[in-house]
Each structure stands twice: as structure tokens, then as C-alpha cells.
Amino acid sequence: MDAYVFPVRVYYEDTDLAGIVYYANYLKFIERGRSEWVRSMGIDQVAMKRDAGVVFAVRRVEADYLQPAKFDDQLHVSTMISTISAARIVLDQTVLRDDVVLFSAQVTLVALDAQGRPTRLPEAFRRKIADLDTSL
């Protein structure tokens, strides 16, 4: 499966006093990348919550900050599936400037029902993933 790539521009609001991207903002960047990846598959997360009572939640993030990004940098967030099971999906996400990896993270997502309890990943979501890569 090819990576989904989402462009991100670094704005002044993203930087700290030193003029580099504040560390927590990388998590915002990869969240945007994940949300756009899901949207690109035709999954409407608002409708999924409304109709099935299911939402995605981040269970775990393991992150490495490798090099700084700076004001006005044009970045790209790359999102790829690492593993998927009935109840969770693990994504490999990177933030790049040109071909240089600045930040990498492995993110574990789970599905929660309307009561906030873990549940199986929605079938429609699993079908969309299967359409992307028949080996999953």
C-alpha cells in the first residue's frame, strides 16, 4: 500500500520562542494527516459517530523528534498502515521536509462505542482498508 501524503505549512503560531515547531504541534500535524487519510477513503467520521455510535481514539503514540521544522517550512505528513486487527489499527506516520524525515511516530488507534468502551473497527472502515491493500 502506498503512503497517504498530506501537505502542512508551518505558521508562526506553530513555533516556539526559538522559532522552531513546538514539539506538541507535530501531534497536531499527524492528526490532520490521519483525519485526511480517513476522509480520502470516503469515511465520514461524523456520520460514523451519528449512525453507529463509533469513534476512533488514539490509544498509544511512540514518537521520535529527529530534526526541527521552522516557520514557513512546507512539510508533508505521510501515513501508512503498519498492522490492523479486528479491534485496532497501527499507523506509521512521518513528517518530512523534502525527503528529510523530521519526526516519526507509530500511532495505535482503537474504536470506541457510544459508552466509550472498546469495540471492533467498523466494517465499512475495514472494507475500505481491504480495498487499499488486499494483503491485509
What are the residue ranges of the model-derived segments?
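Short, basic/aromatic beta-hairpin or loop at an interaction surface
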Residues: 48-56
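A broad, structural micro-motif
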Residues: 21, 56-58, 102
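Residue-level recognition of specific faces of alpha-helices
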Residues: 19, 26-29, 57, 92, ...
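Active-site beta-strand->loop segment that positions catalytic residues and contacts the acyl thioester
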Residues: 59-74, 80-86
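Generic structural detector for well-ordered beta-strands
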Residues: 7-11, 64, 108
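Catalytic strand-loop segment that frames the active site of acyl-thioester-processing enzymes
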Residues: 1-36, 40-43
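HotDog/MaoC-like acyl-thioester-processing domains
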Residues: 3-6, 39, 70-71, 82-136
